[in-house]
């Protein structure tokens, strides 16, 4: 693909703006908070900030790794850590009146624990200040140190996220040499095992079992094949991942890996269907979807609000199938409604009515990711 191939229409977004966007931008400046939305030049920054959603980056804005897709600054922080950051960030986020917050981090290979204790302290402090707040942590691989993974999970984030980023074959070409596809899978597998252990311990003690999820993300259009994407989805599901997001890779600059193809929206829809059929609790697959995209956050909130419907103990449980069927029905109805909005003259097949047991208002189908 030519270096300066124009973006297709479905990848064009309006410029950032709006009162909420400017308020958040000013608030982050005043509170001295780094956001990955800006550091990584996310194309959704305008939309997410208008909706009052943002992803805060911990441990500074210099990453020790140099992946070929990432716009975050690479360097050597030389062990520098702001020990006041957990308290500062927790208090700052608590002031923003958010329902859901994503906290990510730069890789810190210069620290013995990769920054795990720092992240865990921030989560714990934020829980203390805002026990009603749902927290997602998007972390690195901690160089494969599972004790670091345990430390973050034990702090109690509602969602533990770690991205495989790309399919297996091109991992060594696209990601930093210190990253590994299998190591990322091992981190996700360990996080799910730890979540299940904590839930079992709580149940044994007669306490409510915490609802915890794992999440990962894949970029496409960077040299993979469709079959390799499906293979990566199977690998993630085998590792116990609950939520997956798939989005188009966009080149941050001429120094980064070139875009190999612009994946059609129909192909993204096929990836999403395949993921749901594999048993993921949620799959968001569309050109502008990113790991921290707000629609996935809304789904987590809806899932956590499902009354007494606890998460299944194993991926093959009947509860997963029932939940999947319910969500698919909602997604079909939402897709039909959206099609009617976009093209009212287009004939459409009849859509089955909602079953009496369904709760459409609490479910967020991935059709809501399509940009209007």
UniProtKB/Swiss-Prot annotation:
Biased composition (Low complexity): 354-372
Residues annotated for [4Fe-4S] cluster 2 binding in this entry: 63, 67, 70
Pathway connected to this protein: Protein modification; protein lipoylation via endogenous pathway; protein N(6)-(lipoyl)lysine from octanoyl-[acyl-carrier-protein]: step 2/2
Keywords: 4Fe-4S, Cytoplasm, Iron, Iron-sulfur, Metal-binding, S-adenosyl-L-methionine, Transferase
Domain Radical SAM core as annotated: residue spans: 49-281
Main location: cytoplasm
The EC number(s) this enzyme carries: 2.8.1.8
SUPFAM superfamilies referenced in this protein's UniProt entry, alphabetically: Radical SAM enzymes (SSF102114)
Pfam families referenced in this protein's UniProt entry, alphabetically: LIAS_N, Radical_SAM
One Gene Ontology CC term in the entry: cytoplasm
Protein name per UniProt: Lipoyl synthase
Species this protein is from: Sorangium cellulosum (strain So ce56) (Polyangium cellulosum (strain So ce56))
